[in-house]
């Protein structure tokens, strides 16, 4: 909201409202906005006054300034130096008004690897060996208020990422914090984008750049060239997903 925030020509040094709107990141830097760990998808819960945003990762957090010259010190919303795993921030605007300048926030989940680390790199309390992941990217609430999380991260299964598997899609209950893995993608892919059929009996999921390092021939296998695609997932009994 241009008129209600500090983003104007006086505070930013930009020459016009148009420049403030076009060069928003530069304008935000001028007024000292909080730097975030690579924001990706944002989703709003249709059943609850909350919005979530994926902060995918940030190898420079607490190490050096970003390309715009902003400091990227460790802080409450970006709590880890050299953030390898990412986190999801959640906020609730005052009076259920998304144009409000006041809101409450927390970290819904901090991704990590409890098999490798026993410090804050193990992740938040709702991360365990069965649902651990890194680099949350895609994000969507369904009509029931369930949060779907998709990843675009490190699939090496070595070092800090030992045992984390391929990129994946998980489902979360933002009331309880519980997170479960729903599906795992093929080797060397990003799982990105999802939508549901109107009857919620099918979920469509994007599989991007499988075999990008020549480690997979998905979806045709054999010696065929790997290709991005959309997959459709249904239950064997034909009922709604997750009922």
Predicted segment positions?
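Sequence/structural signature of beta-propeller domains
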Residues: 3-243
